[in-house]
Amino acid sequence: MTMSSYLINSNYIEPSFPPCDEYQQSGYIPNHGDYYERPKDTGFPHHSEPSYPRSNYTESGYDYGNVPTTGLEDFNDGHHAQPQPVPQSHGPRLSAAPDGGAGAIASKDCSIASEVYPGVAKGKEPVVYPWMKKVHATNITAGYNGGVPKRSRTAYTRQQALELEKEFHFNRYLTRRRRVEIAHTMCLSERQVKIWFQNRRMKWKKEHKLPNTKIRSSSSASSSASGAQQHQQQQQQLQIKSGQQLVPTPSAVSL
């Protein structure tokens, strides 16, 4: 009960008991010294003198200077050893981060990256070559259900169209080498230059009312076949006529 009340109320005063001379004489309790009141400042008003007279026991003051330090030194050596200096590494030196927070740390990381990679220039955009550009953009309409996306028509600029027209004026057919040069100069692909010249030749033939080469070749082949058939028929007719003339008539044989 005493312990529970002491835990609940921290201001509990431990009771003081008088010297038990009677108990000592009877031998019930051994002589362990006189009890004395526990000095504790509780804030409550109490009597200046204890309720019971104290014995002549004088409490010796605790001298902190006379404490043996051998055990403490061993304890400090084992548990509170001073941290060893950290060896410096060969990498970039990092200083303690100021109170700036994450911004200062990020700026230091950027400076470290610039020191490690000095060749990389800041703010320089990568060079995009013509062959790296995407030529055809795949624009899929909402109603298109096909598996392969349709190609969008290439929109030639005014300068590109003018240069292609100049080249077509001098040469309607391009060699492979010339096509590569034009494509590299105008930032186009070889396929774009080839298709443009094919379409331009068809337009030129329509303007000059010239037949298509494919249609003309097929018509000439059919006409040659029909002419060969007519020639064979004429030869057969001539052979028939000549045979009729050589055969004698029955009137001439009777005479």
Swiss-Prot record:
Residues 149-208 bind DNA. It comes from the Eukaryota. PROSITE patterns: ANTENNAPEDIA, HOMEOBOX_1, HOMEOBOX_2. Residues 34-49 have a biased composition (Basic and acidic residues). InterPro entries: Antp_homeobox_Deformed_sf, HD, HD_metazoa, Homeobox_antennapedia, Homeobox_Antennapedia_CS, Homeobox_CS, Homeodomain-like_sf. It is found in: Nucleus. This is Homeobox protein Hox-A4a. It comes from Takifugu rubripes.
